[in-house]
Amino acid sequence: MKLFGTDGIRGIVNEFLTPEIAFRLGNVLGNMVDKKIFIAKDTRASGDMLEEALVAGITSAGVDAYKCGVLTTPALALITRLENAAGVMISASHNPPEYNGLKVLMRGYKLPDDIEERIEREMEKIRYCEYKSVGKVIEYDFASEEYFEYIKKQYSFLDLSGIKLVVDVANGATYKLNPQILEYFGAKLEVVNDRPDGFNINRDCGSTHPENVKKNITGSKIAVLYDGDGDRCIFVDEKGEEFHGDKILGITAIDLKKENRLKKNNVVLTILSNMGLEEFLKNNEINVVRTKVGDRYILEEMLKNDYTLGGERSGHIIYRDKSTTGDGLITTLEVLSSLVKSGLTLHDLSNRIPDYPQVMVNVEVKNKEIYKNKKVFSLMKSIKDYRVIIRPSGTEPVIRVLVEGPDLEKITDIANKFYELIKELDKE
């Protein structure tokens, strides 16, 4: 059975993702690494169950399990980098609470495909250590503090006094730490969705549901919204308009270039980033490279060519001189730093970057390979002067259709045609 998707192992708990899978993963990792493995989780009720299974698997292979408790993915990535160790993040990111996931990190980085394939093969067998070598379980209470200290050093110059910020922590992993750090830098906060109960993570809140925050933006307030594991964010400006990943990349790329932080004068985007962003960057003499969808592919391109900045429209942004992975908090601080330096409003900054209309439809299907049908290709060939991207979701039974172009009515009509065609083909 195929376990690893685009972002680790992820699925509905006790239907696809079971304690047995967590145990087997822990056992394989314990047999692959030396000494210790760090474990963190978001606020889902199923996190405790999966954590205990992971711990059992790790220690059964003779390796110590360090439990970090509730922590963001980027904070765990930092710990594994500082400790030169492996880690497992228990989270399904932006997915609803019935989902959970297991994301493996090695010295700060997500695993390449070939290592995941090797792990998947090894999970078919279990190898126990001798009873004298069973690993220990260690409560590692310093992870949040280590991350906090790292951020303070990286942004020691930053003064956010005067910034009024609504912070939507999605009832997820950011609910304590991110507000504490933003307050440390002087921002005046209104924190919402910060009462996790195990079942409300991402529920009508956070980066995938900005509608409620948009309604409540007044005066000079702006908002930042995180996802369940804190590796991405989006903003809402003073006018209640969304300031998404493309806008973040455009604005911060200009500042990175001024500060000589933008290596090789290049930004890495995915195929989903708007053509308006690409035009804006090129007009500012910044080059663009595009990859497949997924922050892992962005990072691979960045590492291969030594680029500093890359990201996705969804808010996964990697500042490689600060972090080895997408980090919602670092993204927040970079945007707010640009905002303070500019003396403008976030809305004014946003308006600098053109944004062609995009329509995305999610088509629920039984067969995710249906998008390869000849009739779908035929319809794509018939579309002129508009960009169409069709791809299966890596985590859900969904095919995503993105249409981009200057005319909203036209792209909506095109998107609906693809929706109807794929639905019809899926019935056959």
From Swiss-Prot:
Q: Which PROSITE patterns match?
A: PGM_PMM
Family annotation (Gene3D superfamilies): Alpha-D-Glucose-1,6-Bisphosphate, subunit A, domain 3, Alpha-D-phosphohexomutase, C-terminal domain
Q: Which Pfam family would be a valid example here?
A: PGM_PMM_IV
Supply one GO BP term.
Answer: UDP-N-acetylglucosamine biosynthetic process
Question: For this protein, what reaction is catalysed?
Answer: alpha-D-glucosamine 1-phosphate = D-glucosamine 6-phosphate
| Cofactor binding summary note | Binds 1 Mg(2+) ion per subunit.
Which positions are annotated as binding Mg(2+)? Answer: S93, D227, D229, D231
Active site residues of this protein: S93
EC supergroup of this enzyme? isomerase
As for PTM, the annotation reads: Activated by phosphorylation.
**Annotated keywords:** Isomerase, Magnesium, Metal-binding, Phosphoprotein
InterPro entries the record matches: A-D-PHexomutase_a/b/a-I, A-D-PHexomutase_a/b/a-I/II/III, A-D-PHexomutase_a/b/a-II, A-D-PHexomutase_a/b/a-III, A-D-PHexomutase_C, A-D-PHexomutase_C_sf, A-D-PHexomutase_CS, Alpha-D-phosphohexomutase_SF
The domain of life is: Bacteria
Question: Which Gene Ontology cellular component terms are annotated?
Answer: cytosol
Q: What are its cofactors? A: Mg(2+)
Molecular function GO labels:
magnesium ion binding; phosphoglucosamine mutase activity; phosphomannomutase activity
Q: Matching NCBIfam families, A to Z?
A: glmM (TIGR01455)
The entry's function note states: Catalyzes the conversion of glucosamine-6-phosphate to glucosamine-1-phosphate.
Family assignment from sequence similarity = Belongs to the phosphohexose mutase family.
Protein name as annotated: Phosphoglucosamine mutase
| Organismal lineage | Bacteria, Thermotogati, Thermotogota, Thermotogae, Thermotogales
